[in-house]
From Swiss-Prot:
Organism expressing this protein natively: Salmonella heidelberg (strain SL476)
Recorded name of the encoding gene: cysI
Cofactor annotation remark: Binds 1 siroheme per subunit.
The protein's name: Sulfite reductase [NADPH] hemoprotein beta-component
A biological process from GO: sulfate assimilation
Subunit structure: Alpha(8)-beta(8). The alpha component is a flavoprotein, the beta component is a hemoprotein.
An example molecular function term from Gene Ontology annotations: heme binding
Top-rank lineage group of the source organism: Bacteria
Annotated keywords: 4Fe-4S, Amino-acid biosynthesis, Cysteine biosynthesis, Heme, Iron, Iron-sulfur, Metal-binding, NADP, Oxidoreductase
Length: 570
């Protein structure tokens, strides 16, 4: 990025309506409690439609039947998505059994959706079941607070089953950061858990009365794995270890992938290195980054409000100096680190603690009983006998963690009998999509329902060119908000309209480069024609170990994005 054009620290102007809503909400209460009792509509009205997001929910409807219901003069079939707060993706088997039962008994779709933010979502919760879902989560020690809207969202942590001691330390920090940055309002407990109102005034010492200007995402990452895709996140703590023990973090700030089609003020951006900090300063630094973004982020234009834009406007050195001032530290020079991959190691891995860990590939994270593959039942049966925990990965897979040797055969038998260990290609293991249709209101094109058959066709191209065991990191996202993280893929498809996508190429396998748009608004046959030609060239012309994305850059097929604020749209 450039320091040549620093802008104002605070953007003056008329505040966005979201700022009015937050200010008037009485610390996120609004009239949600009253709205719950309105049986005339299946949805939430007015500001409450947006306020429920702070409580971990989005109001959606089934877009497959929207037109049909409109023709019948019925309102859309409103139902809520709920996203759990689950730092590092760790969930106990007792908790898993509770969420399995709720999904079966109280959701329209009956599924559990693992997400690439290391948590799970329920889709299709009717309004009458909204309060019960929060109470169910609370009863097993979980909540949905701050998993959506203008807060620090679910904190990610590398799912490294081999480095068990290091993972345990990093996971503890992910939990501490998550807890430290949580909102302090009692609105969640009052509305959902029926806790009595306390006479004291609410205060938000970190987030402030109007919370953050926009969503904020945090990771703790253990090199050499970049499984959590740090460059998609606002604030990243890269673990630095000595003799297998965590000693501190490198801090990287200002990553983010969401854009708006045709809006050249928006761009995907990788995170910038700030420096190294010893462990004892972690929470102070996390708070300083968040409060600097709170005070300097753009509250007049939500499309330009994320940390990545603040960093570009004020300049990296200015932002970094303010974080140092607020945290009371000076960053040390970045310590050496490198990434070698970001996919999950599917199958059994033995940890240095001699426990076994079984990583199960879950296509698109959708846990459901399919014909001949009862995945949901299989995981429930494993949860009933497993003494360790489950870990949800940022690749939408699931790890059965900490399995003793004596239980290994029994758990493998259950997994195999329920279709949880069916062999899949390396290409399928490295392909991912967001939910999109039918539930996401922002979806422009299919993603989760499109990817499996599209992957079949890409597998056929690899087979045709004699490289069936190769893989290309491939992501499909249904709209430019980018939940599928296509903007860090070697092949990224971004939904433009039904059946049409923008094709991005030139990312790399380790997730440190933004791909550039190669072709705009094209159909699946056009995409496959382009990929067929380019994969053929890659198979013939690549250098030893060269990934597809690196090849497209070296061969001059695509220019690399070097400074997204300046050249993302070129």
């Amino acid at each position: 990025m450039s320091e040549k054009h620093p802008g104002p620290l605070v953007v003056e102007g008329k505040l966005s309506d979201a700022e009015r809503m937050k200010l008037e909400s009485n610390y996120l209460r609004g009239t949600i409690a009253e709205d719950l009792n309105d049986g005339l509509t299946g949805g939430f009205k007015g500001d409450n439609f947006l306020l429920i997001r702070f409580h971990g929910m989005y109001q959606q409807d089934d877009r497959d039947i929207r037109a049909e219901r409109a023709a019948q003069k019925l309102e859309p079939r409103h139902a809520m998505l709920l996203r759990c707060r689950l730092p590092g993706g760790v969930i106990t088997t007792t908790q898993w059994q509770a969420i399995d039962k709720f999904a079966a008994d109280n959701t329209i779709y009956g599924s559990i959706r693992l997400t690439n933010r290391q948590t799970f979502q329920f889709h299709g919760i009717l309004k009458k079941n909204v309060k019960p879902v929060h109470q169910m989560l609370h009863s097993v020690g979980l909540d949905a607070l701050a998993t959506a809207n203008d807060m620090n969202r679910n904190v990610l942590c590398t799912s490294n089953p081999y480095e068990s001691q290091l993972h345990a330390e990093a996971y503890e920090w992910a939990k501490k950061i998550s807890e430290h940055l949580l909102p302090r309002t009692r609105a969640y407990a009052e509305i959902w858990l029926d806790q009595e109102k306390v006479a004291t005034t609410d205060e938000e010492p970190i987030l402030g009365q109007t919370y953050l200007p926009r969503k904020f995402k945090t990771t703790v990452v253990i090199p050499p794995q970049n499984d959590i895709d740090l460059h998609a996140n606002d604030m990243n703590f890269v673990a630095i270890a000595e003799n297998g023990k965590l000693v501190g973090f490198n801090l990287l700030v200002g990553g983010g992938l969401s854009i708006e089609h045709g809006n050249k003020k928006t761009y995907a951006r990788t995170a910038s290195e700030f420096g190294y900090l010893p462990l004892e300063h972690t929470l102070a630094v996390a708070e300083a980054v968040v409060t600097t973004q709170r005070d300097w982020g753009n509250r007049t234009d939500r499309k330009n409000a994320k940390t990545k834009y603040t960093l570009e406007r004020v300049g990296l050195e200015t932002f970094k100096a303010e974080v140092e001032r607020r945290a009371g530290i000076k960053f040390e020079p970045i310590r050496p680190y490198e990434f070698t991959g970001r996919g999950d190691r599917i199958g059994w891995v033995k940890g240095i603690d001699n426990n076994w860990h079984l990583t199960l590939f879950i296509e698109n994270g959708r846990i459901l009983d399919y014909p001949g593959r009862p995945l949901k039942t299989g995981l429930l049966e494993i949860a009933k006998i497993h003494q360790g925990e489950f870990r949800i990965t940022a690749n939408q897979n699931l790890i059965i963690a900490s399995v003793p040797e004596s239980q290994k055969a029994k758990i493998e038998t259950l997994a195999r009998d329920h279709g949880l260990m069916n062999a899949v290609s390396a290409q399928r293991e490295n392909s991912m999509a967001c939910v999109s249709f039918p539930t996401c209101p922002l979806a422009m094109a299919e993603a989760e329902r499109f990817l499996p058959s599209f992957t079949d066709k890409v597998e056929a191209i690899l087979e045709k060119h004699g490289i069936p065991d190769e893989h290309i990191v491939m992501r499909v996202t249904g709209c430019p908000n980018g939940c599928g993280r296509a903007m860090l893929a070697e092949i990224g498809l971004v939904g433009k309209a039904p059946g049409r996508y923008n094709l991005h190429l030139g990312g790399n396998r380790i997730g440190t480069r933004i791909p550039r748009m190669y072709k705009e608004n094209i159909t699946e046959p056009d995409i496959l024609a382009s990929l067929g030609e380019l994969i053929g060239r890659w198979a013939k012309e690549r250098e030893a170990g060269e990934g597809f994305g690196d090849f497209t850059v070296r061969a001059g097929i695509i220019r690399p994005v070097l400074d997204p604020a300046r050249d993302f749209w070129e």
